[in-house]
């Protein structure tokens, strides 16, 4: 993810770093590369136009002209504007209620059912929650079986009923959670091949009956620009509180992450990093911008390493990776520890 975008942005940054001052000509040349890089990464055209105009305007400002290191200032402007696109970083969930209720929605095939298991697993580990999963996708028997299988793998109870009234199942499931002392409820809802009225009416009814604190749309980042229409389609009917972008570790160009929040106003809460049950991570704009600009996501490296090595060694490893100084022995050392 972002490899091509990172390379092209680095080229643009290096052009400015090689100049003594920023001028209309050299900034226009650099911004042309930035514009093409973003478009090739599948960032929305309107977003690209607005972004490049703002960067150019700031780069030609008086403070930048006075700078002894215009390349560094240009890099900071790029970073600040990318952060503006991605949002303020408020990806935290509202877990203040007892039980806290999270309703997951999405199109058929978006990976909603597996994601609900990943989210329950994450919140149990990170927040110490006791989750209950509710199987309210009554139109696809395989979805209920899949959720039950996930529940067995994770040792998390799944609430299901033999009836086909999804609204009633959700309502009964929440009551069951209260009786049994669960402090977190995650509701798996039905998906469709496209946004339709029947789907939305059912989701609106569930929302009205159980009043979830979070309504999160699960979306496959591989669908690119179509993601914007899907987010807006759901958000027009439901008060979405966030999105989960799946398959951000795959062949996706990543443009949807840079377009979605800016165009829809719906924050990204989590991103999918693998198909494994721990392959979900809280979205952090600072980290993503760091990756885009070629600095690497050092904090993620450290967090992953801390599970098998101590903090001091993790920091040393991360610094080596950032500086490009890791040798074969370093890699072999981490590989040996990861399989212990």
For the regions a protein language model found, what residue spans apply to each?
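Generic start-of-chain signal for non-secretory N-termini
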Residues: 1-7
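Primarily NTPase-proximal linker/entry elements flanking Walker-type ATP/GTP-binding cores
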Residues: 9-136, 143-163, 169-179, 183-189
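Short hinge/gating elements
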Residues: 14-21, 34-38, 58-65, 287-289, ...
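Amphipathic alpha-helical interaction elements
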Residues: 39-43, 63, 83, 191, ...
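Conserved Walker B
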Residues: 138-139, 163, 189-191, 221-222, ...
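Conserved phosphate-handling catalytic cores of large alpha/beta enzymes
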Residues: 170-173, 182, 194, 198-208, ...
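Conserved small/polar residues in nucleotide/adenosyl-binding loops
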Residues: 339-340
């Amino acid at each position: 993810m972002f490899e091509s975008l990172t390379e092209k942005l680095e080229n643009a940054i290096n052009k400015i770093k090689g100049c003594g001052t920023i001028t209309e000509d050299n900034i226009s040349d650099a911004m042309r590369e930035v514009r093409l890089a973003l478009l090739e990464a599948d960032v929305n055209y309107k977003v690209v136009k607005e972004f490049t105009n703002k960067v150019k305007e700031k780069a030609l400002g008086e403070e930048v002209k006075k700078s002894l290191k215009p390349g560094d200032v240009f890099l900071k402007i790029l970073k600040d504007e990318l952060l503006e696109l991605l949002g303020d970083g408020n990806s935290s969930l509202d877990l203040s209620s007892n039980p806290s209720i999270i309703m997951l929605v999405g199109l058929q095939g978006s990976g909603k059912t597996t994601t609900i298991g990943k989210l329950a697993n994450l919140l149990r580990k990170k927040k110490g929650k006791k989750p209950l999963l509710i199987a309210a996708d009554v139109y696809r028997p395989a979805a209920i079986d899949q959720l039950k299988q996930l529940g067995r793998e994770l040792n998390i109870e799944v609430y299901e009923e033999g009836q086909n009234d999804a609204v009633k199942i959700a309502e009964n499931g929440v009551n069951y959670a209260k009786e049994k002392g669960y402090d977190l409820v995650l509701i798996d809802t039905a998906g469709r091949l496209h946004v339709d009225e029947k789907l939305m009416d059912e989701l609106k009814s569930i929302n009205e009956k159980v009043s979830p604190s979070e309504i999160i749309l699960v979306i496959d980042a591989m669908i690119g620009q179509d993601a914007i229409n899907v987010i807006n389609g759901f958000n027009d009917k439901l008060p979405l509180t966030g999105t989960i972008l799946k398959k951000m570790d795959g062949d996706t160009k990543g443009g949807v992450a840079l377009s979605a929040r800016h165009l829809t106003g719906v924050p990204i809460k989590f991103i999918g990093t693998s198909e494994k049950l721990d392959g979900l991570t809280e979205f952090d704009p600072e980290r993503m911008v760091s990756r885009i600009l070629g600095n690497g996501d050092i904090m993620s490296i450290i967090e992953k390493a801390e599970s098998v090595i101590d903090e001091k060694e993790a920091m040393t490893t991360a610094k080596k990776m950032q500086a490009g100084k890791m040798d074969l022995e370093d890699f072999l050392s981490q590989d040996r520890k990861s399989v212990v």
